[in-house]
């Protein structure tokens, strides 16, 4: 996470011909949007596809599954109780990209996506295609065990239950070496 956009610049710097794409989430983009400015500065034609689910939703899902709670994974305002459960932030990724000299499209349909990609291929400068996707929809489960430890000491019953499950997973973990 955070590697894709800089890596796409490296591919272009290595002399790649043809199109170079970075397929990233909104969270990854916000980690290093300055790389897009570098692409413009250096004349490196890359196309960045930003899948916008309003946060680090995969991390949120992992936290919910392993520790029973998530914190700060969604790009939201605080609600009246000061929890991060308010409105989702209206981040304009296209304006951000355009402010750095890239060409940008916001697409909502397959037809718009195809058209944006065709137009991006014709461009000589860096491009960004913004696609808003479902916030909490994921593919099929991977059935893998993640070594993410819930707190050992807690008053929260759900976290205690998940800690027991974690310890069972650790007992089954195999080490190679």
Language-model features, listed with the residues they occupy:
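Thiamine diphosphate
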Residues: 1-177
């Amino acid at each position: 996470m955070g590697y894709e956009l800089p890596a796409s610049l490296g591919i272009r710097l290595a002399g790649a011909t043809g199109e170079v794409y970075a397929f990233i989430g909104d969270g990854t983009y916000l980690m290093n949007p300055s790389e897009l400015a570098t692409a413009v500065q250096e004349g490196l034609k890359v196309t960045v596809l930003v899948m916008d689910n309003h946060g680090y939703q995969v991390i949120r899902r992992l936290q919910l599954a392993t520790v029973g709670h998530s914190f700060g994974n969604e790009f939201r305002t605080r609600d009246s109780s000061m929890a991060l459960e308010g409105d989702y932030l209206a981040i304009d990724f296209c304006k951000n990209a355009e402010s750095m000299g890239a060409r940008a499209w916001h697409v909502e349909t397959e037809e718009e996506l195809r058209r944006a990609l065709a137009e991006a291929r014709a461009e000589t400068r860096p491009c960004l295609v913004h696609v808003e996707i479902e916030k909490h929809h994921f593919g099929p489960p991977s059935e893998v065990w993640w070594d993410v430890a819930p707190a050992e000491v807690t008053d929260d019953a759900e976290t205690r239950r998940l800690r027991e499950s974690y310890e069972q997973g650790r007992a089954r973990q195999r080490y190679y070496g």
